[in-house]
Amino acid sequence: MDFTNYKAHELKDLISKKEVSVEEVTKAHLENVKNIDAKVNAFLYIAEEEALNDAKALDEKLSKGEDIGLLGGAPLGIKDNISVKNMQNTCASKILEGYISPYDATVSESVKSQGGVILGKLNMDEFAMGSSTENSAYKITRNPWDLDRVPGGSSGGSAAAVASKEVPLALGTDTGGSVRQPASFCGIVGLKPTYGRVSRSGVVAYGSTLDQVGTLGRDVKDCALLTQVISGVDHRDFTTANINVPNYENSLSENIKGKKIALPKEFFKDGLDPKVQKSIYDALEVFKANGAEITEVSLPLADYAISAYYLLACAEASSNLARFDGVRYGHRSESVEDAVDVYFKSRSEAFGKEVKKRIMLGTYALSAGYYDAYYKKALKVRNLIKGEFENIFKDFDAIISPTAPTPAYKIGEKTENALEMYLGDIYTVPVNIAGIPAISLPCGVADGLPVGLQIMGNYFKEDTLFNLAYSYEQSTKWHEMHPNL
């Protein structure tokens, strides 16, 4: 019995029935990591000893008849910008090389308390700045569907690990599409919750008003299960909302009769791969057959989302990343004359090219004389975009679009063309600007590569997204596709 072929909810059932132990499941996945990860490069740190100790402790609890929580012994991986006690937390950057977190992020704490077994930390674009996981200071993660292609980013390690069956579940972060776009490229399910639904405490900040921890799994049920575990108010993060978290498993119904879905015409213009467009239109027919009503709408300001996003995200990054100074941990320059030198030289040597570029852009946008012209204007555009979404959700339950304009591209193909790389997030960025939830799920194949469908919902309506996504998933077979490694 190969336990790596099972989804997390299936493993949970097998473990609860005592048909298999948590330790056996953990060992099987660790073995798969050892066999596969040299090809995929999803992991930055493998926590073999910690994982086996945690698995044995959970088996001990089960032997005493104790409940081990919602995850019930399922293994998972954590993106390397989310703190896990006594594990590295490098953000895939040299400036945090060797840094070991002394505490758990709230989401890591939640995962552990609900019986999740953390197998290690996953690769990412440095400080979550990128869409391909080529910006990691340590290694380039490869797409399990084609090892010459990118897995997406910045949570590329998370998506690749799930798609290659190294883990059934993973946590990532999503600032402008960093969970959904890799999910699309790797043919899995990825959810970015509403801003404020999940705690950011213990997560290294990139854009504090845009960042949100998201979940990745091989089907909608797994994604819903992990989202249930990490959602809720947290006194350590004042931006979390004290709004009831529904039982997401109850929303996994195939019935979507009467659901109203909006289709923004601006998301189906030039730049969208015709094969991706066909997959989305084919998916719409499934939603119609299942009883949903689909209407074309207009989101004219969505065209300005990328511009506003890069101003806001970079401005926030320039402030957030000022704390990495080479003094207390991580890389410290050796060719220094004084304390000021430590700060400037350590940062210059240790930050990667993309991170430096975004810090400089953000500092420029916040500087005297440019604040009103750029940053303040971007805030105004953000409010207008939020208003457009709010107006649509007065009449509709959800909005559907592609997740990305193309399938996964070749490693190195877009590294010299920043604009083309940034435009890859054209459908995902508006979601973060508005703070709404969105899910990506597989809906087709283009040239042998997965295509993702994005469903956007109203604030704190993740249950509606799970309902729509589950209905589609159960009517199709795309979630059963797997790469052949």
UniProtKB/Swiss-Prot annotation:
The highest taxon in the source lineage is Bacteria
Cite the EC number. Answer: 6.3.5.7
Entry keyword Ligase:
yes
Catalytic activity, as annotated? L-glutamyl-tRNA(Gln) + L-glutamine + ATP + H2O = L-glutaminyl-tRNA(Gln) + L-glutamate + ADP + phosphate + H(+)
Q: State the top-level EC class.
A: ligase
* Cellular component, GO annotation: glutamyl-tRNA(Gln) amidotransferase complex
Subunit structure, as described in the record: Heterotrimer of A, B and C subunits.
Entry function: Allows the formation of correctly charged Gln-tRNA(Gln) through the transamidation of misacylated Glu-tRNA(Gln) in organisms which lack glutaminyl-tRNA synthetase. The reaction takes place in the presence of glutamine and ATP through an activated gamma-phospho-Glu-tRNA(Gln).
Q: Which PANTHER family would you find in this protein's record?
A: GLUTAMYL-TRNA(GLN) AMIDOTRANSFERASE SUBUNIT A, TRANSAMIDASE
Q: What is this protein called?
A: Glutamyl-tRNA(Gln) amidotransferase subunit A
What organism is the protein native to?
Answer: Clostridium botulinum (strain Alaska E43 / Type E3)
